[in-house]
Every structure is written in structure tokens, then in C-alpha cells.
Amino acid sequence: MKLLTLNTHSLSDANEDNKLKAIAHVISSRDIDVIALQEVNQTMNAKSISCDEHYVGRDIIKEDNFALALSKLLEGKYYWTYIPVKVGYDRFDEGLAIFSKHKISASENTLLTTTNDYSFWKKRNALGVEIKKGPQSFYVYTAHLGWWDDDEEPFIKQWKKLNSVAASKDMPVYLAGDFNAPDVLKDQSYETIKNDGWKDTRDLAKIVSGRFTAQGKIDGWDEAVDGMRIDYIWCNRDENVLSHEVIFDGKNEPVVSDHYGILMEDNL
């Protein structure tokens, strides 16, 4: 099974069409099974539209939705779902999306923050889906968590909620996304996740390519100019991970966001 995660930072750049085409090309050419996306945006005042049967979500989709545009480029070969999480940059519904080549049999939208104020930029949710691939069912969550030392909405409270729902699943589970959790900081977010029993798929991989997933200044990390590893794919068991590679970094496929992506393959 091939799983890609990417914080798309969508609708924020002038070259959205090229970005979409690059992402769709990689998904198709590499035959990726599941794609977990964060910062998937649509303009709040854009026109609402109806989607075809491959959209399995319940939330309203606007005509410029980034995931909708990606679905069209993928020519209906993937099921997909989307949730809006909060207002982004005063004009977007900022949300999460998951694409799957295989049937999505269930989904859940989990509020991670104390606040449920849609207009508050620190609001966080996780989108989870159950996917059936042949005889095997597994769960994938996509999430974009906050910062360890945030006074209002600290990482630890968000993580406890995500861990509570994800750890309850009696099947393989993958947590994919932007965790704002540099792996070099001791006794903080990264080590908290590991201490709760989750496996960093990079540690399990037989072949590893790349490290940093964000380079230079990005939102929330104004002083992080040397590069950070803050995007991850975690699993709840010692999977046979074949490879873990940083992608869309300008070396391994073109840069399409202020984050790089991660592509993981295991034998599920």
C-alpha cells in the first residue's frame, strides 16, 4: 500500500494549475493508493456545486475546491472526502481531504481543540476514513495539529483526542499529516506520540530518502530557516515498511507547497 501525505497550502499561490497537475501526475504515475491532504481550501463565497459519486463526503463543496480540482485531474479513479475545519486567511474554508483508490466504507470528523469556533484560526479537526483493500480493512487519519507550547490550544490536548479515537481501532491505523512536531525537540510532541506506542514509519522503512519536510520560514515557524521534519506518517504496529521518501522537495518531484510531502509504501 502506498500512502502520500501533503500539506498543500492550496489556493495561496499563483501557479495553482501547475501545482495540481504535478500532484496528479505523481499520484497516477506512482499508482498511489491513499492520499492524505491538509490545508485543502475553497473560497468561502464561491458557488456550491454537486459532485459525482466518487465524492463520499457530506460537506458542501465549492466550485474552486482544491480537492475537487484534483479529483477531476485524476479522472474519477479515486474516491474522496473533504471536511472544512476553519476560516483560513479570512477568505477560505480551510479543510482536510483523503483520496483512496479503494472503497471508503466509513468516515469520521473528530474535533481536536477545545474551541469549536469556526472563525478561530487555532481550531483543529482530524478526518478519518476506513478503507477496504481486498480482504483487509485499515484506517487512515489526516490531521494538522497545533504547537506544543501554545497557551490556548496546546498540542498535548489535541493529541490526546486524536490518540483516543485512533488507538481504539482494531485494525491497522495510519496517522498522516502536519503535526508541527520537530523530531529534534526532546520531551515534546514527537516523543509524546512515540511514547504512546505509535511507530514512525521512517524508522521502520528499509529504504529511506530525504529528511526535512519544511525548509525556511513557514507559517508558525518564522525562525526555522534550516529545515525541519514536522510531517509524518505513523502506524499502530510494526508494519513491513518498504520505503519512506520525502517528495515534492525539488529533488524528488517539483516543489508544490511550503511543505514537502511524504510517500510511504508498506506490504499491507
Named regions from a protein language model:
Residues 37:
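A short beta-strand submotif of the Rossmann-like class I SAM-dependent methyltransferase core
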Residues 1-34, 77-268:
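Active-site regions of metal-assisted phosphoester/phosphodiester hydrolases
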Residues 15-17, 40-73, 88-93, 184-193:
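Metal-dependent catalytic neighborhoods of phosphoester/phosphodiester hydrolases
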